[in-house]
Swiss-Prot record:
Recorded family membership: Belongs to the protein kinase superfamily. CMGC Ser/Thr protein kinase family. CDC2/CDKX subfamily.
Region (Disordered): 383-406
Predominant subcellular localization, coarse grouping: cytoplasm
Assembly and oligomerization: May interact PAK1 and RANBP9. p110C interacts with RNPS1. Interacts with CCND3. Interacts with CCNL1 and CCNL2. Forms complexes with pre-mRNA-splicing factors, including at least SRSF1, SRSF2 AND SRSF7/SLU7.
Organism: Rattus norvegicus (Rat)
Active site: 203 (proton acceptor)
Entry keyword annotation includes Manganese: no
Phosphothreonine: residues carrying this PTM: 129, 236, 392
Binding site for ATP: 85-93, 108
Protein name per Swiss-Prot or TrEMBL: Cyclin-dependent kinase 11B
Length: 436
C-alpha cells in the first residue's frame, strides 16, 4: 500500500512547479503588479467571499506550502463581486469588476480541498492548458489572484456573456442553419487548435461553450483537459460528461486520443440543431443503449478492436439496425450536413473525422452559408442576473462506471432487464447480456 505521502504527491504539484506556471501567467500580463495589496482602506462589503482574517501566529501556521509561488499575485479584494454565475465540479465562477480598471471579468475560484498540502493537479493542468492554447475561440486567462490569507486561488478570465446550454434553454426558437454553421466552424477551429497543440479537452459540451454578445464562441472549462502523446498512453476511461461521451470510453477503452473530443463535437452539433441533447442517457449502460438504438450495434467489421473492449468482453448485445439517426433531424439537416454528422459519430475512432477535415467539409460551403458572427442576435445575459442553474445536464465524471443506475428506457420493450438465467449468467434482455 502506498504511503500517505506518496498518495498526496501523486496529485499535487510542489511550489517550484506552481511558480513556473504562475510565471507564465504574469508574462502575459501587460503590467506586472508586485506584492500583495493589503494596505489602504477596508474593502467594500461586496468583495468576493473569503476566509476570516487570521492573526500573525495563525497565519504562519495556516499558510499553504505553495505560498512562495503566489507572492506577487494580486489580492481578490481588488475585485468587486457582482454576482455568482455558476458552480461546477472544479470551481465556482463569479462575475466581478476590477476596481482599478472598471473592467468586467470572470473569476473562477478553484476548489482547494487539500490546499495546505500543495497545489491540486486539476487546477494546475487547467491553468497550464489555457495558457498553452491561446486562440480566439478559447477562453483567455488574464492573471491569478489570491484570497486575503493566501488560502484561496482565483483564475481571472475575460468575461463572456452566455454559455450555450443556458442560452438554448431560454431561446424560443432554435438557431438558424447559418448560425449553427458559424458556431460549428468556431468550435472546430478551437478544437483544432487544441489538438494541434497535443491537448485533449475531454469535457466538450454545450455548457462549456461560451458565446459573446459579438457572436464569438469560446471553449471553456479545462478542468479535465490534459496533454497527450504518441504512442498513446493508458488514461482513465471515465472522462467526458455522460451525454457527450464517446462509445469507446463507455465500453472501457483506456487508450484514446482526439477522436473522443470529436464524438462530443458531433453530439453538440445535434444539440445545436434541435435544442435537445442527442443522447441523454441516465447511466453508462443507458447511454450505450441510446447510441446503439440510433446508430446500430457495432461489430468487428465496422470497428476493428471492438470485441476486445473491456465491456464488450463482459456483455453481449443484440443486433440493432444501422442507422436510424437520419429521421431524428428531418429537414433540419441537409444530406451534406448528415454526412458530416455521420463522420463525427463514426464508431471506429481511427475513421472518425478530425477537426481539420471537419472544417473543410462541403456542409459549410452549401447554402445557407455561415453568417458573420457580428450578425448574431443578442439575448439578455443570464449570467448577469443570477446564479446559472445547469438544468438537467449531468455532472462531469467523478469516477466509476454507473451500471447500477438504469434510465427510463430500461423498463420499456426496447430497453433491457436484468434477470438471472439457468446457467448463472445475468441477462439484460432483450438487447444485451452480461457474461461471467
Amino acid at each position: 500500500m502506498k504511503s500517505e505521502k506518496s498518495r498526496t504527491t501523486s496529485w499535487l504539484f510542489q511550489s517550484h512547479e506552481v511558480t513556473e506556471i504562475l510565471g507564465r501567467v504574469k508574462k502575459n500580463r501587460k503590467k506586472l503588479v508586485k506584492g500583495l495589496h493589503r494596505a489602504g482602506p477596508p474593502p467594500e462589503k461586496n468583495y468576493l467571499p473569503d476566509s476570516p482574517a487570521l492573526s500573525p501566529i495563525e497565519l504562519k501556521q495556516e499558510l499553504p506550502k505553495y505560498l512562495p509561488a503566489l507572492q506577487g499575485c494580486r489580492s481578490v479584494e481588488e475585485f468587486q463581486c457582482l454576482n455568482r454565475i455558476e458552480e461546477g465540479t472544479y470551481g465556482v465562477v463569479y462575475r466581478a469588476k476590477d476596481k482599478k480598471t472598471d473592467e468586467i471579468v470572470a473569476l473562477k475560484r478553484l476548489k482547494m480541498e487539500k490546499e495546505k498540502e500543495g497545489f491540486p493537479l486539476t487546477s494546475i493542468r487547467e491553468i497550464n492548458t489555457i495558457l498553452k492554447a491561446q486562440h480566439p475561440n478559447i477562453v483567455t486567462v488574464r492573471e491569478i489572484v489570491v484570497g486575503s490569507n493566501m488560502d484561496k486561488i482565483y483564475i481571472v478570465m475575460n468575461y463572456v456573456e452566455h454559455d450555450l446550454k443556458s442560452l438554448m434553454e431560454t431561446m424560443k426558437q432554435p438557431f438558424l442553419p447559418g448560425e449553427v454553421k458559424t458556431l460549428m466552424i468556431q468550435l472546430l477551429s478551437g478544437v483544432k487548435h487544441l489538438h494541434d497543440n497535443w491537448i485533449l479537452h475531454r469535457d466538450l459540451k454545450t455548457s462549456n461553450l461560451l458565446l459573446t454578445h459579438a457572436g464569438i464562441l469560446k471553449v471553456g472549462d479545462f478542468g479535465l483537459a490534459r496533454e497527450y502523446g504518441s504512442p498513446l498512453k493508458a488514461y482513465t476511461p471515465v472522462v467526458v460528461t455522460l451525454w457527450y461521451r464517446a462509445p469507446e470510453l463507455l465500453l472501457g477503452a483506456k487508450e484514446y486520443s482526439t477522436a473522443c473530443d470529436m464524438w462530443s463535437v458531433g453530439c453538440i452539433f445535434g444539440e445545436l440543431l434541435t435544442q435537445k441533447p442527442l443522447f441523454p442517457g441516465k447511466s453508462d449502460i443507458d447511454q450505450i443503449n441510446k447510441i446503439f438504438k440510433d446508430i446500430g450495434t457495432p461489430s468487428e467489421k465496422i470497428w476493428p478492436g471492438y470485441s476486445e473492449l473491456p465491456a464488450v468482453k463482459k456483455m453481449t448485445f443484440s443486433e440493432l439496425p444501422y442507422n436510424n439517426l437520419r429521421k431524428r433531424f428531418g429537414a433540419l439537416l441537409s444530406d451534406q450536413g448528415f454526412d458530416l454528422m455521420n463522420k463525427f459519430l463514426t464508431y471506429y475512432p481511427g475513421r472518425r473525422i478530425n477537426a481539420e477535415d471537419g472544417l473543410k467539409h462541403e456542409y459549410f460551403r452549401e447554402t445557407p452559408l455561415p453568417i458573420d458572427p457580428s450578425m448574431f442576435p443578442t439575448w439578455p445575459a443570464k449570467s448577469e442576473q443570477q446564479c446559472v442553474k445547469r438544468g438537467t445536464s449531468p455532472k462531469p465524471p467523478e469516477g466509476g462506471l454507473g451500471y447500477s443506475q438504469l434510465g427510463d428506457d430500461d423498463l420499456k420493450e426496447t430497453g433491457f432487464h436484468l434477470t438471472t438465467t439457468n446457467d448463472g449468467a445475468v441477462s439484460c434482455r432483450p438487447w444485451c447480456s452480461l457474461l461471467f
